[in-house]
Amino acid sequence: MAPQQPQPTSQDWDVEFNQVRREKLFRDPPTDRTAYPALQAAVDPHIESFNALFRDDGKPSLLDHALAEIGTKTFLDGDERADPQGKNKLTIRYKSIELQKSQVPPTNRWAKNREIFPAECRERHVSYRGKLSATFEYRINDGEPHEFVRELGQMPIMVKSNKCHLQNNSPAQLVARKEESEELGGYFIVNGIEKLIRMLLVNRRNFPLAIVRPSFQNRGASYTPYGIIMRSVRPDETSQTNVLHYLSDGNVTFRFSWRKNEYLIPVMMIMKALVETNDREIFEGLVGPPQSKGVANTFLTDRVELLLRTYKKYGLYSKTQTRAYLGQKFRVVLGVPDTMSDYEVGTEFLRKIVLVHLGSQDVTEQQDADKFNMLLFMCRKLYALVAGDCAVDNPDAVQNQEILLGGFLYGQIIKERLEELLTVSFRASLRDYLRRNPTVSFQSDTFLKDFPIAIFRRANENIGQSLEYFLSTGNLVSPSGLDLQQVSGFTVVAEKLNFLRFISHFRMVHRGSFFAQLKTTTVRKLLPESWGFLCPVHTPDGSPCGLLNHLAHKCKIMTESVDASTISRLAFELGVVNISSAATSESVVVMLDGRIVGWCTPEECKSIAETLRYWKVNGENGVPLQLEIGYVPPSNGGSYPGLYMSSQPARMVRPVKYLPLQKEDFVGPQEQPYMSIACTEQEVIPGDSTHVEFDPTNILSILANMTPFSDFNQSPRNMYQCQMGKQTMGTPATALAHRTDNKMYRLQTGQTPVVRAPLHNTYGFDNFPNGMNAVVAVISYTGYDMDDAMILNKSAHERGFGHGSIYKTKKVSLKDDSRTRSAKSIVKMFGFAPNSTIRESTRDMLDNDGLPRVGRLLREGDVICAWHTVSADYNGQLVNRDGVTHYERYKDSEDAFVEEVRVIGADNGTEPLQTVSIKLRIPRSPVIGDKFSSRHGQKGVLSQKWPATDMPFSETGIQPDVIINPHAFPSRMTIGMFVESLAGKAGALHGLAQDSTPFKFDEQNTAGDYFGHQLMKAGYNYHGNEPLYSGITGEEFQADIYIGVVYYQRLRHMVNDKYQVRTTGPVVPTTGQPIKGRKKGGGIRVGEMERDALLAHGTSFLLQDRLLNCSDYSKSWMCRQCGSFLSTQPTVSPFIGKRKAVSTVRCRNCAVRLDDMEDVDLMQIDGEIWEDGSGTQWIGGENTTIVAVPGALKYLDVELAAMGIKLKYKVDKKDEIRRGQLVGKKAGDLMLTA
């Protein structure tokens, strides 16, 4: 009998608990495939975009396209300034690029298994990378081609990509390799930290966007705000933005940016250079044939006439003339070799810059004609925009955007680095070589011996290092700027705070750091176009609000082109022609991937779109399912009509049901605004609706779907929950033993929620529990629950409610950064120095190897490891000579346990131990001041652990775990929490997992009714209320109390991490105020609210203590007369002799210099003569006093004086110097007489 085949893992999930099945999957991970395909699909865009760089399926990869784009570079020998004729020519190009999987370096002779897995890189705090190498091909004077290979450094590899050892591993294999059973991948590991390239929203590719920007007027005289922008994308995913500007005299200029410089060219010159054409052809191309309606449009014909007339001044008519003219102007800009003629440079300019999506490698005449037609269409749309016949395209709408994927951006950086290596580094080292050896030609034996090794060695070949820098900092160092609006903020740390946080990173889409600084809020608005593509709920509050969005959970991103080769033929069969008119009522454009296929009437256009869609869904005639068919109908001043089809990558698509065939169709953001898609089956309008949503929750992100009954809540509360779900102290990972994160939070007593959406199981969130089911009573009890505080049952706390731990990793390295690489220069080693005296307490803490014992409790000041200095003796052995043992100590104030000690070896395996990584566990039981929240944005602080004996109890003997105040609900309108409480109670009584998917209930079929009947069946009150008895008096409460089961989350904001105490400590040198920062022992800030509270309490004198005495109290001399700090100075008494001691302080401003007084009798002088430090003598200025002022005030005074502003203070007269005699009037009444 044949052995039974293993059954494939079932991937279907429902809303039930499924605990046994989940536990089996966890204990015996499947050996065939994942049980949670939806979870793996969430990360697909990241992995697939990286895989596109190095394909192994025979199709050309993105880097193959990039190498073809870089092309062949030419170098000449001899004198640089001499004429190129008669010189030898060296041509060199990249033939291929190879990336190896991660391996131990060849210098390591000890390793048996040479593969390096990601888990090892995390634990060793190093980067997960492979060797990058390039094969070059060169010829001398068109001779035989020769090849050589150069290594380009170590390049970071994306986890689970096609260059990673974990690709296509089953869950069982992943567990064996120390990963999660459901390891997602999609990130890089740099220095042991998981880094992710975030997805960015950019302009839609190959589509002319009509925009109005007031800043366009600043480009020069007669420029207007009108323009057409086209972000044109090459096959290797690099882009070049082309802009057409409308000038007030009817002219149009073509603008582009090259290596961060902008250039403007008349659009007529580009057209004349592309094809051999004449004025009539251009006129008819813009306006239409003589008999068409477009000719009647005088607005258009007048401007086209001006466009043609003003170009006459250049005197360039033929294609050859125009290309040579462009080549002459752009020769230096493009950096082309001297051997190229002006005409060839012009051709190169058109290839590299003008509408590159229509041909950027070996451009044919047909492709040039396509570029010409596209420019005509862009001019036509620009004139329509100016005339008001077409609306402005909104660049902030998802309809006009696409996503720049991490892998594609990574590929763009690799391409640019490869090009820089040839055009900059290699060119410089070759030039340097030729200068040092002026007599050597490319054909000489000396050169053939030195090339390529001696010349390439001087070039900076380490591309891997610059990629690692990009990933670790997120900063882009690029000479071209890669056609992006930002240079930083491209990468984020994929934090595993909890699993929800981790998965959200991969679905995050950012608008770009440039928009974060804008003062306008238009870019942040939630627009209806993003329905089903971007989640309307899941965006942070605060500064990134609306800029950092998350993809809806069903939204997919295309990572490769679909085959649209039959579309052009089908379009012509359906009635598309080549003749067009400027009047959109007569003809509209049919475009595929930014190439004009042809033109047709608006009526034909609609039927072509409907026919293609039917074929597409039915899989007929080779129309791919993921093709986007963006039909824009004609309108009165609306969007420019046409049929815009797209088959290229980086598009968002989402599944909906196509009603005529009842099959799945994928729609894109450009076609959706003009389609009729019903939300539910009941809303389908016969004869109008073409599609219906599979599920109304498809518009929400993964995390927003986890909020139970979110349709019952006020919208901001759902947004808050999306943030708080990501700040929960949950279960970050199951492979905790193989992670060395700087800080990791873990909840020890996690539970599966009773109330949850079916997606909770689909995504396998039960493997990473995020909270606990708590019995919650809504009652105002004891007053400790005011202002969102919550009371916790002390017994629940003792049973482990919310108990968690923090894991911290401390790395101790003895390596000295300045030391060289040879092993002989090791100067420190772990362990005790021989013959040194060691305390008994230290012996208890450390083992004989000088490392801490696992499981030991550490307190502040305890030793965590011992080391001693070493040097090599005459045998090369490392010995200690001074007999002194040095210790590293634990500096944190919190007690911790040593969880794990890792000894980390060197790459080559020959060095003694130099680095250890110690993981510490800090238990964190909930204490007063820790933050908790329900799944409805109802956050609160634990205010008291109330003894169980004093807690209220129900008739069935149930005591609540948590008590919250009823005032938390009315203003916040979180009705979802009431429903969850009912559902959780019913679910707990019947042993059911309750489905909390939103939009399930309506006015006829209410949630209260549904769950109320379940409660009645269990013998409880229909409304969820119960009579409770006071735990203190034992009497029944006057009112019934609402009590049920709610899933509670413990947030990571704990009072132990936040409390701040300070008496005296470091101050800011300039102001004298306490520094800020808890770590540095800084002060606690008293702001305006605190000030108002103290004033309201009638304790205003406390304010003086807080804001002056405890802050920057200082005593300072001041002149009463002129009211200034700045003019006072200490005097020097002239009679003390050589010591010249400082005596009193005088005001220099009010005093008179003795030398400036004429005929003065020293005996008659009224006042004291005093001397300053330089020996000058003065009289007067003694009206000074000491005042108490804040140090910051003196600093402000000096700063303002530097700007020429003088501050004058009035001093209270209470302590003025008394002069004259005292005359008594009445007893006890004193009066001052002058």
From Swiss-Prot:
A zinc finger (C4-type) spans 1119-1150. SUPFAM superfamilies: beta and beta-prime subunits of DNA dependent RNA-polymerase. Belongs to the RNA polymerase beta chain family. GO terms for cellular component: mitochondrion; RNA polymerase I complex. The keyword Magnesium does not apply. Its main location: nucleus. Its EC number is 2.7.7.6. One of its GO terms (biological process) is termination of RNA polymerase I transcription. Signal peptide: none annotated. DNA-dependent RNA polymerase catalyzes the transcription of DNA into RNA using the four ribonucleoside triphosphates as substrates. Second largest core component of RNA polymerase I which synthesizes ribosomal RNA precursors. Proposed to contribute to the polymerase catalytic activity and forms the polymerase active center together with the largest subunit. Pol I is composed of mobile elements and RPA2 is part of the core element with the central large cleft and probably a clamp element that moves to open and close the cleft. It comes from Neurospora crassa (strain ATCC 24698 / 74-OR23-1A / CBS 708.71 / DSM 1257 / FGSC 987). Keywords: DNA-directed RNA polymerase, Metal-binding, Nucleotidyltransferase, Nucleus, Transcription, Transferase, Zinc, Zinc-finger. This is DNA-directed RNA polymerase I subunit RPA2. GO terms for molecular function: DNA binding; DNA-directed RNA polymerase activity; ribonucleoside binding; zinc ion binding. Transmembrane segments: none annotated. The keyword tRNA processing does not apply. It catalyses: RNA(n) + a ribonucleoside 5'-triphosphate = RNA(n+1) + diphosphate.
